């Protein structure tokens, strides 16, 4: 199919319309490697049944950032078993803003603790307020958080795949403000 489109057998389709066809530029390696916070729960201690997707209530979380100069971001949560997606537009990527968005989600969701048992996320600075993120607005702990290894996006693959699909509608450089 891809070769037919490249050979222009389908006049209305272009390479840009294909999900996997468009080439990507390689990122420059940063000089300083990013190290995960050693005091926070790693994905290595995450229970095996979460990785197997045998029960619902386990989510993956990430941010989609807009163009340079744009502060607004999209917070995406993907349920690992059902692939349900929650997308929230936030005014900025500060950790406090993320925490408030999770608080708002908890207040609006009936039976929150049954629907949100754990969240797997990356080591972005916006997700490193561990104590504040796990503290429920109703008291106690709202869910468990597990942090992926640095530069290991495949450890939360469902969310990364959904973010890639979202990027088809909001390509890099989109202003979310």
Where in the sequence are the language-model features?
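Basic, flexible linker segments flanking DNA-binding modules
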Residues: 2-51
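An active-site-proximal beta-strand-loop segment
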Residues: 48-85
